[in-house]
Amino acid sequence: MTNHPANGLDDVVHQRVRLGILTIAHEARRVEFGYLRTNLDLTAGNQSQHLTVLDNAGLISIEKGYEGKRARTWVSLTPAGNTALRDEIAQLKRLINQIDRNDKRRKREQPT
């Protein structure tokens, strides 16, 4: 018996906000905290919790510094984060393919 594709989804990556953070971080070398917060419609506290989960899992790196006199926090995808994101996408594609196959099978089985 084969495993259902849903079993391959990573709970750390798959959560909506964390998947969004990883996806946006994949688009740029590094992304600023405020940009993530605005684009994912998050509170600073909620975003910080998700960043901590991803950082603890080794999927992102967090860099704090200054831009002029303003404190900034930047997020970057680590190589492990890139692999985890790609693995998650592959599992989602498997899940979609299974749904498509089931839909086609059901259409064939419908009485005419």
Language-model regions, residue ranges each:
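Amphipathic alpha-helical dimerization/coiled-coil segments
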Residues: 1-6, 23, 82-112
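N-terminal helix-turn-helix DNA-binding core of bacterial DNA-binding proteins
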Residues: 5-46, 66-76
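Intrinsically disordered, low-complexity regions enriched in polar/acidic and amide residues
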Residues: 14, 46-48, 90, 109
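Short, hydrophobic-biased segments on the C-terminal half of alpha helices
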Residues: 51-52
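Glycine-centered, phosphate/nucleic-acid-interacting loop/turn motifs that mediate DNA/RNA or nucleotide
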Residues: 58
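Short beta-strand "wing" residues that participate in macromolecule-binding interfaces
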Residues: 62
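Accessory beta->alpha helical hairpin/"wing" motif in late/C-terminal subdomains of nucleic-acid enzymes
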Residues: 77-81
